[in-house]
Amino acid sequence: LPAAGKAEAAKLAVVPLANHVEDNTTASMIYMEEIMDTFKFPEFDMIAEDVVDKAVGSRNISDFSKANLERIARESGADIVIAMSLDKLDDKALFPRREPTLKLDMSGEFAFLNKVTGRYYVKKYSDDMEIEEILTVRSDWKSEEFAKTVRSYLKKVTQFK
């Protein structure tokens, strides 16, 4: 954003992840880590959490409409607002299979508003995938897949289409 011949950092309001998955304590941390990796200073200046919380009005956003994101942007002073929910992140064994197999079901919603470019994007996401169980022994497969989903949607925020 130009101001007196200088480019200023875009002010970024990150709405806390609305995590509706019981017994999942890592999703919010993954969400914030991916945001911190994607939106770095000096290009982006993250607005303080207490300011965003006050603008959102509650910890779990349920309204991803353009009007609501515009309100959050106005009340927080943000140029860009990012919001996401995780409604389902569940894996289960599939039987009978030749090799033990797991199926992952993941769903939620992602939205952003960029006042600089005028872009608004909202998408309900739903994904299911299968993997041989042996490949998940030394990893947190569910968390890794959620992180990939977060990264793919955060890329949309920085695109200018």
What are these language model-derived features?
Residues 23-24, 91-97:
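Extracytoplasmic/secreted cell-surface and envelope-processing proteins
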Residues 1-13, 29, 72-75, 91, ...:
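C-terminal/domain-edge helix-coil "capping" segments
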Residues 8-14, 20-83, 117-119, 153-156:
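N-terminal segment of the mature soluble domain
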